[in-house]
Amino acid sequence: MTYLLIAALACERLTTVAVPHAVVTSAQSVAAGALAEFNTLPALCRVAATLTPSPDSDIKMELWLPAANWNGKFQEVGNGAFSGSIALPAMAAAVRRGYAAASTDTGHTGNTAGFALGHPEKVIDFGWRAVHETAVAS
């Protein structure tokens, strides 16, 4: 077996990993250049998960793991202001440099603060917990 095939098999098995307050929703091997919007990426393992550290939490995250030439480092990338989206372009830049990269939607979608009204736990998710939980789950 080649290294990339072994890495692909290991990637698919990440859906069975038990992570506190998390459900791994997908883990798929992505061939080099296969993501249309990021066609210069090397082969990677793309993992998606939902984190629920509180009953009101609904934090989405992705983790991209280089299939080869990992530099041994992890980089979590952020998003700006009230942005509730996973920062895929920043993750792609990190993976191109050999990093394992992760990002979170900070527990909401969209770019307004409406998610926070009447949801103090979501404010905590946005303020710090989503980033922390993403790093821990990664």
Annotate each predicted stretch with a short phrase:
Residues 1-4:
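Positively charged n-region of N-terminal signal peptides that target proteins for export
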Residues 6-73, 77, 89:
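Catalytic-loop region of hydrolases
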Residues 80-137:
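Cap/lid segment of the alpha/beta-hydrolase catalytic domain
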